[in-house]
Amino acid sequence: MNAPIVRPLAELRSMVRGWKSRGETIGVVPTMGALHEGHLSLVRAARASCDRVIVTLFVNPRQFNNTEDYAKYPRTEHTDAALLAPLGVDALFVPDGDEVYPPDHATVISVSGVTAPLEGAHRPGHFDGVATVVTLLFNMTGADRAFFGEKDWQQLQLVRRLVQDLKLPVEIVPCPCVRAEDGLALSSRNQRLTAEGRTRAAALPRTLFEAARRIEAGAPTAEALAAAQEGLEAAGIGPVEYLELRDGETLGEPQLGRPARLLVAAWLDGVRLIDNVAVTLR
């Protein structure tokens, strides 16, 4: 039996009120659908630690700054429901766009600082769309805990900052990035790669991990990043939008003694791929 699909907000809120009245905890996994093993790992984590699990499926138009990317984003609701069936999801919330954003919707939530570099510099307005929809979904679902993958590292830091600054009563639970056998981070957009492109894409994580290893071994950061850039270009991956070492929390300049993160965004077959890896600075 597929996961029960709930569309009207009033119906979801009625379910949530019943659960809350019994003191049950609610775990939420926000998604845009086109589910893969990465999403399912978040659902399993929610199932293991919460009494009730809601998966949200909403392709948020406000976080796309490219209309073609929005139009091409995979929409596979029935397949998604079937994938969730064995995982014990209590509700697959698929709201109508007009219920999330009525015609007179006028509120935008913007988080500064952590959103400025990397994705923020290349996708204007993207993080405003993310912050706004995440806040809406937390309110709609009554989330006690929300589960986010570390693949979208900058998004994870945004959500943490959002919850902290707005004093939202939601615990943010980070979950490890899930990778294919060749190391490529799982993403709904990967299915748009050609067979040849999918093979070449394995060079992205391989190059990223090698650059991280070199930096941890003491190589100058600029030298390691230049070699990684050359490696990506040699593999036919590009253009590279960014390949940067950043502080793991603030995404400012990395500091000795603090966790750092190496992040990349690059194009292949007309598909934008992102990835990141932890780096220990000594």
UniProtKB/Swiss-Prot annotation:
Residues where (R)-pantoate binds: Q63, Q155
One function term, GO molecular function aspect: ATP binding
Residues binding beta-alanine, per UniProt: Q63
Swiss-Prot/TrEMBL keywords: ATP-binding, Cytoplasm, Ligase, Nucleotide-binding, Pantothenate biosynthesis
GO biological process terms, semicolon-separated: pantothenate biosynthetic process
EC number: 6.3.2.1
Pathway annotation: Cofactor biosynthesis; (R)-pantothenate biosynthesis; (R)-pantothenate from (R)-pantoate and beta-alanine: step 1/1
Record's GO cellular component terms: cytosol
Chain residues that bind ATP: 32-39, 149-152, 178, 186-189
Catalysed reaction, written as an equation: (R)-pantoate + beta-alanine + ATP = (R)-pantothenate + AMP + diphosphate + H(+)
Family: Belongs to the pantothenate synthetase family.
Functional summary from the UniProt entry: Catalyzes the condensation of pantoate with beta-alanine in an ATP-dependent reaction via a pantoyl-adenylate intermediate.
Subunit (UniProt): Homodimer.
Protein name per UniProt: Pantothenate synthetase
